[in-house]
Amino acid sequence: MNWDYPQPFTLPAMPQAEDIDGLNHTNNAVYVQWCEKIGWAHSESLGLSLGDYQRLDRAMAIRRGEYDYLLPTALGETLTLATWLTASDGKLTMERRFQLIRNRDQATVLRGRWDLVCIGLSTGQARRMPPEFCQAYLSVLARPADRP
């Protein structure tokens, strides 16, 4: 697959009947839910779960979400969703990117981006990333893949 960044963390996706909207394609809100699902799965694969967030009283919260819906997808299509961590100041902020590819023709149907900020769960206020976040997340920051 022609990924925007190397070494993606991926999950399969397939629109179900309840995901299809009145325009007869996957509702845009479903893509947002899939992005949340893969974001958590990626974090857990790096050793940080919701339980760890609660124990550390820290979380990476979405400050801004941006989605480019490039092509529609239909009921039962096989898709692959990828995510990467692509930037961080190592203190408060991080960027996560997403790309959704339709398997049958390798077309990119969605690109997304989250700007994240570290917060204290107990206060909701911005707080410095704990060492556990830096160790897990900063070691996997991706750089854009070469494109023709």
Give a label for each model feature.
Residues 26-28, 51, 128:
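Short, electropositive, low-hydrophobicity segments enriched in small/polar residues
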Residues 1-45:
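Catalytic strand-loop segment that frames the active site of acyl-thioester-processing enzymes
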Residues 37, 41, 45, 68, ...:
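Solvent-exposed, charged/polar functional surfaces in cytosolic regulatory/catalytic domains
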Residues 14, 66, 115:
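Short aromatic/hydrophobic contact patches that present stacked aromatics
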Residues 42-94, 109:
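Hydrophobic beta-strand-centered segment that forms part of the acyl-chain substrate-binding groove
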Residues 23-24, 83, 124:
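Hydrophobic pocket/interface hotspot
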Residues 1-11, 74-78, 86-148:
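HotDog/MaoC-like acyl-thioester-processing domains
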